[in-house]
Amino acid sequence: MRSGVIAQKVGMTRVFTDAGEHIPVTVLRLSNCQVLGHRTSEKNGYVALQLGSGARKTVYLPKAERGQFAVAKVEPKRKVAEFRVSEDSLIPVGAEIQADHFVVGQFVDVTGTSVGKGFAGGMKRWNFGGLRATHGVSVSHRSIGSTGGRQDPGKTFKNKKMPGHMGVDRVTTLNLRVVQTDVERGLILVEGAVPGSKGGWIAVRDAVKKPLPKDAPKPGKFKVAGDDKVTADAPTEKEGA
């Protein structure tokens, strides 16, 4: 199981195929996505990679967070997240993951925070049909109607679909196809819509319900400071010694 990446949503556009068909895509940018630390089964009880992306001024960081970035020898990051991986998919601390970590044609799962809609009624929030336009209905055409409570049970049950705050939820969209990657600019173009507003942080992972392509690099495509790109086929320090 490979690591995912932390990307930033740039916006939507479209690309054209050789046949002239257009594909709507969302542009995701990798903003210096680096490995900050490892989580091991011996020390933490599970195996994961801690990644950071974006830039943040040191003056706004608490001392504890400054120390974490100092240990990893990386610049302070705006967004930090963990990705569960297998033991053979650990990437060295300080390495920067590249856009070609994902290959064209593979499917990915994306997770983000949906756009806030504020207080919404039942028709917008839950797709209710509303009440009749005439025949005795006045003013309350868009109301939700009965909430289901009579003398028995004498209450409205929890989790009843009612008007309330809509949006700003953690949303995952499955099986989006990677259309194109740009390593130089750190861009990943995925087909379809991605949850969140422009500038929002998105977690991109290999699709859990689709097979991983055979040409996908393992443990990933990354760059170590002062070195060229490294893949799983490259020898480790112990093997080269």
From Swiss-Prot:
GO molecular function per UniProt: rRNA binding; structural constituent of ribosome
PTM field: Methylated by PrmB.
Residues annotated with N5-methylglutamine modification: Q151
Record keywords: Methylation, Ribonucleoprotein, Ribosomal protein, RNA-binding, rRNA-binding
Stated role: One of the primary rRNA binding proteins, it binds directly near the 3'-end of the 23S rRNA, where it nucleates assembly of the 50S subunit.
Methyltransferase listed as a keyword: no
Annotated region (Disordered), positions in chain: 139-166, 209-241
GO biological process: translation
The protein's name: Large ribosomal subunit protein uL3
SUPFAM superfamilies: Translation proteins
Organism whose genome encodes this protein: Nitrobacter hamburgensis (strain DSM 10229 / NCIMB 13809 / X14)
Pfam family, one: Ribosomal_L3
Family from the record: Belongs to the universal ribosomal protein uL3 family.
Highest taxon, organism lineage: Bacteria
GO annotation, cellular component aspect: cytosolic large ribosomal subunit
Gene label: rplC
Highest classification ranks of the organism: Bacteria, Pseudomonadati, Pseudomonadota, Alphaproteobacteria, Hyphomicrobiales
Transmembrane segments: none
Quaternary structure and interacting proteins, as annotated: Part of the 50S ribosomal subunit. Forms a cluster with proteins L14 and L19.
